[in-house]
Amino acid sequence: MNFKSIAKTNLLFGSLIISLGLQALPAAAQEVTDAQVSALVEALRQAAPPQTANDGMYSQWQVLPNNISRWAKFCTKQDLTPQQFEADATKAKSIVTCIVGDLLRDEYKASSNNDLTAVRRAACWWMTGDSAACKSGATATYAEKVISVYQQQRPKK
């Protein structure tokens, strides 16, 4: 074999390896925008069950009290009581937005960047703590309501 044929073989072999390697890479991850996060935050708020006195949930987003301190520390590096969370709608929205942003990014990955599937999974997690829990009943109805509001709120492409 001469030098030219060896070089040609190496070039073809190298091209084949690069092609196979590129095919094995996952599709480019779609970046979740602030507008999408805001749309989901608003959808979760609008879809939340009506607040009733002493229902054990706090704010317009109906957050369980055991999440509030943990989420506040994660998002703001400050502790917050459920009563403080309830009393300060701006701070509550900021914390919810922080958590929902991470949640939506995770669900985008889990749904192969499918927008509505990611939103459905996020809504399920928000209500139950399990992204796949909205198969039927009240949780499925809630997830559908979140999707409907999200579609109205999200930025048009």
Which residue ranges define each predicted feature?
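Substrate-binding/active-site groove segments that recognize
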Residues: 56-78, 124-126
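Short, functionally critical alpha-helical segments immediately adjacent to catalytic or ligand/cofactor-binding
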Residues: 32-52, 63, 96, 120-130
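Solvent-exposed, acidic/flexible segments
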Residues: 33-37, 53-57, 61, 85-93, ...
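Catalytic and substrate-binding regions of cell-wall glycan-acting enzymes that process beta-1,4-linked
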Residues: 117-157
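Bacterial N-terminal signal peptides that target proteins for export
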Residues: 2-14
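C-terminal segment of classical bacterial N-terminal signal peptides
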Residues: 18-27
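Sec-exported extracytoplasmic/periplasmic mature domains
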Residues: 45-53, 69, 73, 97-108, ...
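Alpha-helical segment that forms one wall of the substrate-binding/catalytic cleft
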Residues: 74-120, 128-131
